[in-house]
């Protein structure tokens, strides 16, 4: 734990000091992903978070999370210059409209230097519709998503986890977070293997929480590799802490933002 350190929080500050995140997430079939990713971004310390999504999604979660700002997808796309970090893909869906929208977002962000986290359906779309990623991108695939991104079999990835992570970082010119029991974080020069976590994290929605945590750390001006490394640690350690009270069987993804502060306090 001594190797991990949270970003500094100056007392002479305001919400803008700790970054503005725009989260393109959710569709009517995957409403929960937008909530989990957004609340996690706030819980790790981002100063301002906006969710750009469909009307059904916003209607469902806006009363659950009044701290966030809510925009339509189109409003989000028009206002990218107001934000410092972007999270794309959690529950976005893979229908034609989502595919077109994903391409439009990336084309817009290629003009920017702000960090971008791509997760879940964003990765599924990227695998089928390759497009150059913006500078300072982080991708967060599980092994099956990694296999699609690399054009290989799932077994190939499982048999070669470290080399697969390196290949992802090289192919997409990004930081790759290959999510496994011992998640691998790497870029073109560095590789780190996380040693925390348990089966409590093997639940739907857990990856949305991780993506949100990483985006929130980026908002506080952490470099991409360090934000990914710390985000993976906090996520996995939170799973361990929550399991002590709830058991590995009963921890839900929605429990992770609730227990996140305990993992943070351990390294302050």
Question: Which residues make up each language-model segment?
Answer:
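Small-residue (G/A/S/T)-rich helix-start motifs and N-terminal tracts that mark the onset
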Residues: 1-117, 124-138, 147-268
